Amino acid sequence: MSGTLARIAEIEAEMARTQKNKATAYHLGLLKARLAKLRRELITPKGGGGGGPGEGFDVAKTGDARIGFVGFPSVGKSTLLSNLAGVYSEVAAYEFTTLTTVPGVVRYKGAKIQLLDLPGIIEGAKDGKGRGRQVIAVARTCNLILIVLDVLKPLGHKKIIENELEGFGIRLNKQPPNIGFKKKDKGGINLTATCAQSELDNDTVKSILAEYKIHNADITLRSDATADDLIDVVEGNRVYIPCIYVLNKIDQISIEELDIIYKVPHCVPISAHHRWNFDDLLEKIWDYLQLVRIYTKPKGQLPDYTSPVVLPCSHTAAEDFCTKIHKNLIKEFKYALVWGSSVKHNPQKVGKDHVLEDEDVIQIVKK
């Protein structure tokens, strides 16, 4: 472990010394690829034994979505969780109170959302300091990350946490790079770009792939990509998670300062202690989770509007709905009757591939 950390420090120092220009792009690409490989060794150490990377921290996934609270010790994560979910996470006025993951559940708009108060991150978590590695391993399984910041401490904290999460392959508020990557048996590296590239050229791409011992592949760049984008695609273990920055303790700043904070993208100012602005926070959480609620209607009865079946927006076909209810339901599926915004007529007869929209009502007709 210490050998890997030393090599990471050497490469980071060399990258800091190297000026960024066209002439050094090849060399920097090579260094970035080496760095990514070493980081991967830290995330998944070689050799068996011991628990997984999130040992002792992970909590069984329940509900329709999972949110992780990440932040430095004593920024108010536990207070926020206890006031949001009514869970009493041990709150104290000294740093490092929460030493294991504390789960809570909040019900909002019919959805059951699991909240995880993850232990405070210290700088250097991605290098295995503190219990940061386990914390970040749990953060990778979340549908949304809330980075809780103390409004009085500068946004330097924000940068440190982002770097820690980035080092563990978590990309915040980003889409996966639009890069096609396909390994093949022969034919060398074949690079095609559908738009002008400011950073990547043939030599840089080859140097990065050579570091991964890939000498035959088809690469298609569909956007102006960076060396980091290409490395993310080759590594293939990146997770893309939406993120909200929660600025806590706004009771200690002026109205003018609050106006400035409101203009920062992905930010919600709150006071966990006074429960100020929780409505705004919950509304933003709902927007970022992009959940779809489907109501059920048993034959000959009124729809049940009390407990919707909640689906992620990427899987909202009638088939996904059936699978969520019971894995065998799809085998008995004949057709479905749907009322709501996804159909032209109410009700409309649809097949298993029909894509449902938020607050649709569905009745399944079995064979």
From Swiss-Prot:
Its EC number is 3.6.5.-. Residues 290-366 form the TGS domain. It is found in: Nucleus; Cytoplasm. Residues 2-16 are annotated as: Required for interaction with STK16. GO terms for cellular component: cytoplasm; nucleus. Its cofactor is Mg(2+); K(+). The keyword Cell membrane does not apply. This is Developmentally-regulated GTP-binding protein 1.
